[in-house]
Amino acid sequence: MPRSLKKGPFIDLHLLKKVEKAVESGDKKPLRTWSRRSTIFPNMIGLTIAVHNGRQHVPVFVSDEMVGHKLGEFAPTRTYRGHAADKKAKKR
């Protein structure tokens, strides 16, 4: 369910300050953040943001199609290794 238009998009203040500083200085170093809940804004386009997935920081290069989505959508938290093989079929 989307957020109310009356409230507007959410972004953590500390992340917004980091983004503005990086855009102002032209720095291309990845910005480390734990804020998976923050919305991607248009001024983030072209930046690499390292989003924490619970274990490590996953680098996410922000493109124009990502604007409006949350940072956490691009850093998966669960690893799927597949279902266990069928032991009966393996023996034959």
Swiss-Prot record:
What do the Gene Ontology cellular component annotations say? cytoplasm; small ribosomal subunit
Q: Which GO terms describe its biological process?
A: ribosomal small subunit assembly; translation
Query: Which family would the database say this protein is a member of?
Result: Belongs to the universal ribosomal protein uS19 family.
The protein's job, in short, is:
Protein S19 forms a complex with S13 that binds strongly to the 16S ribosomal RNA.
Q: Which domain of life is it from?
A: Bacteria
The record's listing under Pfam families reads: Ribosomal_S19
Q: What is this protein called?
A: Small ribosomal subunit protein uS19
Q: Which residues form a coiled coil?
A: none
Protein keywords: Ribonucleoprotein, Ribosomal protein, RNA-binding, rRNA-binding
Instruction: List, alphabetically, the InterPro entries matched.
Output: Ribosomal_uS19, Ribosomal_uS19_bac-type, Ribosomal_uS19_CS, Ribosomal_uS19_SF
| A molecular function (GO) term | structural constituent of ribosome
UniProt-listed NCBIfam families: rpsS_bact
Q: Does the keyword Kinase apply?
A: no
